[in-house]
């Protein structure tokens, strides 16, 4: 067997070849799939990293049209709360609204509103054995401001003269009722007066602001969450499912391992309807085995990330473009989407990844600098930066719920001596996520215009690459000039 198989390429090694086009960038469609059954309006996924994706960024990305994957360096309860926060941020009809019983106190209402960042709570009778909740009233922030005693029952201040609607109401009719009655919340009941949901004026406004938002069938923003291969993983999945998660990602550095295959199969056996992403991998054989285990999408990328040191610490990996092409060819046999994870520096790299066969791209560093990311903001020499670290860094692996299992290292070891496969650093602050997304998608649409393709599927099928030299790469970047004003989509820091 030959030891050296073939040359492998990454994004900087190639360019897409321009073609005849009658397609304008504004006419292109960038919808895609993140798993077999989950569509996204933008082919962007945020990485499950503790300096990248928590609820705030996941909300912003889903509203833009992509999807965020909440990292797992959190306790089970906290990670589930992040998922629930995304799912409750925007809804058509809130099907399981938070409620209070009639004997609750005003202080309990205050605590509940603060904990869940809500401004109104339906009040119901204690449930029947069948679990039905008979609506009795509603208590809002306005009611709470009118009282000074927090120990009184909420029945003393709640509104009982209620404006309600039936379950079959559409949002246009709901908006009209809300405006006519000058109220912010419309309670949805059945014919017997049992609470079935809640429609808020704020949710209707949010839908208008973000028409391309990535939502589930109930009008809620979509969100994913990472899980590992620890003994408590199924308990974590249980909590995430209860919180309403749309997809879980079995997230490891080496997805082609028996522990990952077993975990994917176990999750799918317990939750056959739950979408499961598995990874990371770099070979067709790995894709085949993960799909056979039950994966609904496969994440590709061994070591391409800017903060990843796997390729130099372990000497293992695959240049990302070749990895995507090899894996996508195998995935196409079972109609399984590929997520290209890592190595994206510019919007042009997104185009190359999709043209190579990926359905979406997962990014960490590009999103880590945004206002919505959870990384610490750092001031250095008069400039704003945000902390960014790999999940294989010492800091990330040493957290109480750290990522050591992602790299198959024992979290219970007394010495806590890990072998890191990532670093900790800082990146320039980039401002709001929606501005970053605008530039990324603008670059992708421009690429599609140059290539004469109208959608992602055509980008995958009807494009060609040309290999370039190091001189060609230098020529591709600005040269023989001193940049006096940086563009919003190009930086010399890469």
UniProtKB/Swiss-Prot annotation:
Gene3D superfamilies according to UniProt: Aldolase class I
Every copy of the CBS domain together lies at 93-154, 158-217
EC class of the enzyme, as a word: oxidoreductase
Keywords in UniProt for this one?
Answer: CBS domain, GMP biosynthesis, Metal-binding, NAD, Oxidoreductase, Potassium, Purine biosynthesis, Repeat
Q: Does the keyword Repeat apply?
A: yes
One Gene Ontology BP term is:
GTP biosynthetic process
Q: Which residues bind IMP?
A: 306, 341-343, 364-365, 388-392, 421
The UniProt activity regulation field reads:
Mycophenolic acid (MPA) is a non-competitive inhibitor that prevents formation of the closed enzyme conformation by binding to the same site as the amobile flap. In contrast, mizoribine monophosphate (MZP) is a competitive inhibitor that induces the closed conformation. MPA is a potent inhibitor of mammalian IMPDHs but a poor inhibitor of the bacterial enzymes. MZP is a more potent inhibitor of bacterial IMPDH.
CDD domains per UniProt: CBS_pair_IMPDH (cd04601), IMPDH (cd00381)
User: Which Pfam families does the entry mention?
Assistant: CBS (PF00571), IMPDH (PF00478)
Q: Which family does it belong to?
A: Belongs to the IMPDH/GMPR family.
**Entries under HAMAP family matching the protein:** IMPDH (MF_01964)
Protein name (database record): Inosine-5'-monophosphate dehydrogenase
């Amino acid at each position: 067997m030959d030891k050296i198989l073939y040359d492998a390429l990454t994004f900087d090694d190639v360019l897409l070849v321009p073609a005849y086009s009658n397609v304008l960038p504004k006419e292109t469609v960038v919808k895609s799939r993140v798993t077999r059954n989950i569509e996204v309006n933008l082919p962007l996924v945020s990485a499950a990293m503790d300096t990248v994706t928590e609820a705030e960024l996941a909300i912003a990305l889903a509203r833009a049209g992509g999807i965020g994957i909440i990292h797992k360096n959190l306790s089970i309860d906290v990670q589930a709360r992040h998922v629930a926060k995304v799912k409750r941020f925007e809804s058509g009809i809130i099907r399981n609204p938070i409620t209070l019983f009639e004997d609750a106190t005003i202080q309990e209402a205050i605590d509940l509103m603060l904990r869940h960042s809500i401004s109104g709570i339906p009040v119901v009778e204690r449930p029947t054995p069948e679990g039905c909740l008979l609506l009795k009233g509603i208590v809002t922030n306005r009611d709470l401001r009118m009282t000074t005693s927090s120990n009184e029952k909420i029945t003393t201040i709640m509104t009982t003269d209620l404006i309600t609607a039936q379950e079959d109401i559409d949002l246009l009719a709901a908006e009209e009722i809300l405006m006519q009655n000058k109220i912010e919340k419309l309670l949805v009941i059945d014919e017997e007066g049992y609470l079935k949901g809640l429609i808020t004026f704020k949710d209707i406004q949010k839908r208008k602001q973000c028409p391309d938002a990535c939502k589930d069938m109930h009008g809620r923003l979509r969100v994913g969450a990472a899980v590992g291969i620890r003994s408590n993983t199924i308990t974590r999945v249980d909590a995430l499912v209860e919180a309403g998660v749309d997809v879980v990602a079995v997230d490891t550095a080496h997805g082609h391992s028996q522990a990952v295959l077993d975990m994917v199969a176990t999750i799918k056996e317990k939750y056959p309807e739950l979408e499961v992403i598995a990874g990371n991998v770099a070979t067709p054989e790995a894709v085949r085995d993960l799909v056979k285990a039950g994966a609904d999408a496969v994440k590709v990328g061994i070591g391409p990330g800017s903060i990843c040191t796997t390729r130099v610490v372990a000497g293992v990996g695959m240049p990302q473009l070749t990895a995507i092409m090899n894996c996508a060819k195998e995935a196409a046999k079972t109609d399984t989407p590929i997520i290209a994870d890592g190595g994206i520096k510019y919007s042009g790299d997104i185009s190359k990844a999709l043209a190579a066969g990926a359905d979406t791209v997962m990014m960490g560093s590009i999103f880590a600098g945004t206002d919505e990311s959870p990384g610490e903001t750092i001031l250095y020499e008069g400039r704003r930066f945000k902390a960014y670290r790999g999940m294989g860094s010492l800091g990330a692996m040493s957290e109480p719920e750290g990522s050591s299992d992602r790299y198959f290292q024992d979290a219970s070891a007394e010495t806590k001596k890990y072998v890191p496969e990532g670093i900790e650093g800082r990146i320039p602050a980039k401002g709001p996520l929606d501005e970053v997304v605008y530039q990324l998608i603008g670059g992708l649409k421009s690429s599609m215009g140059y290539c004469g393709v109208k959608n992602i599927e055509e980008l995958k099928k009807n494009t060609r690459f040309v290999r370039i030299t190091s001189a060609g790469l230098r020529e591709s970047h600005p040269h023989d000039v001193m940049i006096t004003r940086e563009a919003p989509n190009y930086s010399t820091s890469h």
